[in-house]
Design a protein with these regions (language model features):
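DEDD superfamily 3′-5′ metal-dependent exonuclease/proofreading module
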Residues: 1-247
Length: 247
C-alpha cells in the first residue's frame, strides 16, 4: 500500500527553510529541523503538497535520503473542481489557511484536498479518467497522483483498434466544440492545456472560468478554448457551431 507524507514548508526570501510541517497517518511533524524531517518521512513512498513540484521539493531535495514520488494537489485541482466557487480550500494557487506561517496546518489542508481530489477522480466517467491519464500521465506535475492511487488505464483487447487520445477527446466533447477543430494538433502540442480546457468545457457552467494561475502557467489555454468554441466553421452540419454560434 502506498504510504504518503503530506508536507508544507515556510521559506524565507533567501531560500532558507524556516519551518516544516508534515503529516503521515496519525503522526505529525512541526519543526525547523530538516534532518529530523528527512527521518520522519523516510518510510514513505510519496510526498504530497500544494505546488510541491515547483516549490517545496527544490528546497528539500538536498536533505532527502532517497527519491520520492511527488503528488501535487495544485495542478489537479482545476481538473477535478472546475465549477465556481471551486474547492473550499483553494484561492487561486494557494490553500486557504486558518493561521499564517503554520506549515503543519497547511499540511493537514493538503491532505484533505488530496483526499477530495481522489474521491472526485474516482467519481469521473471512466473514459474521462482514461483521457486525463493519456494526456497527463507523462508529466511530472500529474504523474505522481496517478501512481499514488495505483491507477490502471483501460486496455482494450488486441483485436480492437486502439482509440487515439485526440479521438477520445473529440468524442467526449462532441456537441460542445466545433467538429472541424484540429484536435489532433492540439493534443500533440498542448496536452496539459487540452486537459484544462476539457474540464472547463464539460463543467458546462457559464460562471466558471480558468483560474488565474493556470493562465499564468499555461497561457495557451485561452487561445485553445477560443479555437474550439468561438470560431464558427460555417458548416450547417456542425452541431456545435450551428446551434451555439449561429443562434
Amino acid at each position: 500500500m502506498t504510504k504518503i507524507a503530506f508536507i508544507d514548508l515556510e521559506i524565507d526570501g533567501r531560500g532558507k527553510i524556516l519551518d516544516i510541517g508534515g503529516v503521515k497517518g496519525e503522526s505529525r511533524f512541526h519543526s525547523a529541523g530538516v534532518s529530523a524531517f528527512a527521518e520522519f518521512i523516510s518510510d514513505c513512498d510519496c510526498l504530497c503538497g500544494h505546488n510541491i513540484v515547483e516549490h517545496d521539493i527544490k528546497y528539500l531535495r538536498p536533505f532527502l535520503k532517497k527519491e520520492y514520488v511527488l503528488i501535487d494537489t495544485l495542478y489537479f485541482s482545476p481538473l477535478l473542481f472546475p465549477h465556481r466557487p471551486y474547492h473550499k480550500l483553494l484561492k487561486d494557487d494557494k490553500i486557504l489557511t486558518d493561521e499564517l506561517n503554520n506549515p503543519l496546518n497547511d499540511s493537514l489542508k493538503a491532505k484533505a484536498l488530496y483526499e477530495d481530489e481522489v474521491s472526485a477522480f474516482k467519481a469521473l466517467d471512466k473514459d474521462f479518467q482514461q483521457l486525463y491519464y493519456d494526456l497527463l500521465g507523462g508529466d511530472d506535475h500529474f504523474s505522481g497522483f496517478f501512481r499514488s492511487i495505483e491507477y490502471v488505464p483501460s486496455r482494450r483487447p488486441f483485436f480492437f483498434r486502439k482509440t487515439t487520445t485526440d479521438e477520445s477527446l473529440r468524442e467526449l466533447l462532441r456537441g460542445k466544440i466545433c467538429e472541424h477543430s484540429d484536435v489532433a494538433s492540439l493534443v500533440k502540442n498542448h496536452r496539459v492545456e487540452c486537459a484544462y480546457a476539457a474540464a472547463l468545457i464539460t463543467a458546462d457552467d457559464r460562471n466558471s472560468i480558468t483560474p488565474a494561475w493556470v493562465l499564468r502557467n499555461y497561457p495557451d489555454v485561452e487561445a485553445l478554448l477560443r479555437g474550439l468554441r468561438a470560431a464558427n466553421c460555417g458548416d450547417p452540419g456542425c452541431a456545435y457551431c450551428s446551434k451555439k454560434l449561429n443562434a
